[in-house]
């Protein structure tokens, strides 16, 4: 499903231009999406020409003041720079000081819908770990752990088996001080007295100046979970200790910054974000670079046939780092996210209170996201890692016997709990809900080719 990123009307006749950019003019708004990352169609008809006479612009936020000052000083920012500021600005970023997940937040994720989801992820990791002889120690690494629900459900399964319980440790990559506290409460029941994430950035720089890359003391927080498993928090993946690792990135890559490019008769141009002091509904607007930018020259494939493209260099760096670790230390990884195979170009959007929201409206108050280009990730790890998928979430979970797990739980459940279990199952696997919209991609070191040829990864093939 393609989502038009041009989510506001730009009235004809805008006169404000910059030396390196043109205002984008277009005729209408047509945004499709889904509640909690999926919803119903809304907005204006794409073919009609609407004229807006806005009496009042949208509310100004603290982050908007910061963005306006930055743009006034240095010029329009890229969409990638905008996303990074909106989501992770230390003072006013969306993720930094609030609970954004669940019914009280802006999005709902699979682990929050059913504990079975995390249990099956743990089962998958245990299966792949067993295939290669159960190497020790075993690091479970989650990127962007949300509330900690997925990790908590996985550890409950790991702790049931002595082989894994005695060797496993949990490593969480999290930049948000608030979310790291929620994760610690969920996993450990207490919050340790430690430096916050912002102070950890200074610690990160110091450690990389004065310690070896192999140092295992780069965490900014450490505790013991309710299951007796050591858990540590890190601001960067590079701080996580090296070893045989099971990587899980659930709805993580879709929040990483993307550059947006548009094909014109003069070649590729980058979409930028500028101040709008005119009659637009918000204080910011999209503009088009007048010429090629360094990003458009470097990131757009000369053979690209789409008219618009989104590229996330940060995603590329991270997936390559994971591939290198798998190649050097062994392990496996799962990327679970909304995404496509390189066929889409306009997916940048925002969510607030479980509904689509204009990305330029009141920055810092809504979640920003862009679908993951799985073909881009696979291309970047080619030769370093084996990849399987992406396949739909519903297919993966059915192959992992989620229905059998559901039937077992229903036998001992009350009527009310049975209703909840069935509803959660439908939400996770149904094609018109999350079943087709979320995708699973697996990564393995290339030296596992022979093993995986004989015994393909669980979940990616139908069980016998």
Give residue spans per PLM region.
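A short SAM/SAH-binding and catalytic strip from SAM-dependent methyltransferases
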Residues: 229-265, 309-313, 317, 325-327, ...
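Short, well-ordered beta-to-alpha junction loops that form the rim of enzyme active sites
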Residues: 145, 250-252, 336-339
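A mobile, often basic/glycine-rich helix-loop segment
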Residues: 246-300, 348-359
